[in-house]
Amino acid sequence: MEKFAFIFHPLSVQDMEHVSPIMHYLPDSFIEACLKMKKPFKVSHITGLKSPYAEAEGWFIGCTLTAKQMVTLPEEFVVDRIVECGKIAQELGAKIVGLSAFTSIVGDAGITVAKNLDIAVTSGNSYTVATAIQGTELATKIMGKSLDSCRAVVVGASGSIGSASVRLLAKKVKHITLVARHLPPLEELAQEISRENSCEVAVTDKISSALREADIVLTVTSALDFIISPSDLKPGAVVCDVARPRNVSREVSLMRNDVLVIEGGVISIPGDVNFNFDFGFPKNTSYACMAETMILALEGRYENFSLGRSLDVAKINEISRLADKHNFKLAGFRNFERAVTEAHILEVKRNADLSLAVHGK
């Protein structure tokens, strides 16, 4: 039996209301102070993971810091807390531990965490990129578009997920715009992309102007607040929001019935899996970052796989191959905890066609 663990944390104080309704009545500052003092702990035992080649069990480990705390508290304190989580996983018998959300971003993106543990560590970012591109391509096709005629925008293009996504998307689209707060790393990446691909490449730190012309948007920033609003997008745009917390405001889906918003990396996993914890997904599905940890465990690949600020495209392709081998698949589309059906996508397409016919843009 292979063994793995996965570290996760509340994205915001509001997430704690799912644990206890009384949290709704307590000040955020009080809850954050309590979370800072609380030690990591085992949340649940994961059973039933089984592919044609192997079986595995695992554990969820709770890191009691919100996303805001992870970027505002001293880096050393946060990294030490994540290492504590990893040591719990180690004591439980896990041979690889996965990082989620901001635990994979803080500090040097998992490298120091791995150095302080005796088990393998992965961020899950390689499979996150693979499935985000796969899902975006499929959704775009259902919307009646071909990637090779599309203008794509990657928001957060200088990060590990963003830059890897750029490298893969650039091989498929007509034009790609890289967006981030700091231009120098974008310009360096753009030069690399231009040398290796035939698509047109642009860079900018002006997100709204870039989005207005985008057929495809892949957004992967570590922003704590929404950065994409309803007025930013053109009719027919396909937006894949990989970020946690989300980059795309809920108002986009509520106010723009001519724009398709999907979440990146929702995966169907093999076996009859019981997470013994409700994180809002249907049975036998998970985030792609979680799935990467499971795939590596089933394969017996107990090595540091996706760490640091740069992702290897060869590893993205490799984890995709291993996912296919162990029967991990894209589980359709979701947005704000709801399924996005093909019928809904076709309705968005009709609304976009009508909007373009009426307004001509």
Model regions: which residues?
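Glycine-rich phosphate/diphosphate-binding loop of Rossmann-like nucleotide-binding domains
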Residues: 138-216
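Glycine/serine-rich phosphate-binding loop and adjoining beta1-alpha1 elements at the start
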Residues: 50-147, 275-287, 299
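Short, ordered loop/turn segments at secondary-structure junctions
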Residues: 101-104, 126-127, 181, 244, ...
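Conserved acidic residues
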Residues: 3, 95, 174, 215, ...
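Rossmann-like adenosine-cofactor binding region
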Residues: 198-272
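Adenosine-phosphate binding glycine-rich loop
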Residues: 2, 6-8, 19-57, 64-67, ...
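A short helix-to-beta-strand connector/capping loop
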Residues: 56-57, 117-119, 196-202, 257
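Short, charged/polar "capping" segments at the starts of alpha-helices
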Residues: 104-108, 183-188, 247-250
